[in-house]
């Protein structure tokens, strides 16, 4: 009888160990398949612009607007801020980059963000003009392909709302990518498409 008890106890131990391994493996497989939600900051930082560069001038401005919205409206670490700056600079033309060295650009963004926060300003919505409103030109002097894209920004400052417009000038580079060459504030635009 004693031998039967030992055999039953041994079988019970083996069954418990096997059940434990099965449950642990099943739990790990279940959790490894879960989708991880990325923050807006992480989505921008993780975008591989080498292989997934925006195809049109509008898409470049939309991506840049996502970066701007994150600059002014999200929380991020210093490391994430540096990565955001690198992403923003990847959609800028070499001429714009030369005129705005990385350290100067970073400092200007930091100051502007601090000013926004001090004034309780928030970018509520960004919009980009319709595809048929993008103006394409060729520079007669050097043959550069240019595109002009209008964007609008709906900004809240405390309880006051304001809408501003910017014109982006983009130039096609040697790889065929549209890069932001310049941008400046303008008076209103007749129509836009929401980016949000």
Short names for language-model regions:
Residues 109-157:
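Surface-exposed, charged secondary-structure patches
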Residues 60, 147, 164-166:
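Hydrophobic core residues within well-ordered beta-strands of beta-rich domains
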């Amino acid at each position: 009888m004693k031998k039967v008890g030992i055999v039953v106890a041994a079988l019970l131990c083996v069954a418990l160990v096997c059940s434990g391994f099965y449950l642990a493996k099943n739990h790990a497989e279940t959790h490894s398949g879960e989708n991880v939600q990325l923050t807006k900051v992480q989505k921008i930082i993780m975008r591989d612009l080498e292989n997934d560069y925006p195809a049109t001038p509008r898409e470049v401005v939309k991506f840049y607007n996502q970066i701007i919205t994150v600059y002014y409206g999200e929380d991020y670490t210093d490391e994430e801020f540096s990565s955001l700056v690198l992403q923003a600079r990847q959609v800028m033309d070499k001429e714009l980059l030369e005129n705005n060295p990385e350290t100067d650009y970073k400092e200007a963004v930091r100051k502007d963000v601090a000013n926004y926060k001090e004034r309780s300003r928030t970018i509520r919505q960004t919009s980009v003009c319709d595809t048929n409103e993008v103006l394409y030109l060729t520079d007669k002097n050097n043959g550069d392909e240019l595109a002009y894209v209008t964007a609008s920004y709906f900004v809240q400052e405390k309880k006051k709302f304001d809408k501003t417009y910017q014109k982006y000038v983009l130039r096609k580079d040697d790889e065929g990518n549209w890069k932001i060459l310049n941008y400046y504030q303008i008076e209103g635009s007749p129509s836009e498409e929401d980016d949000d």
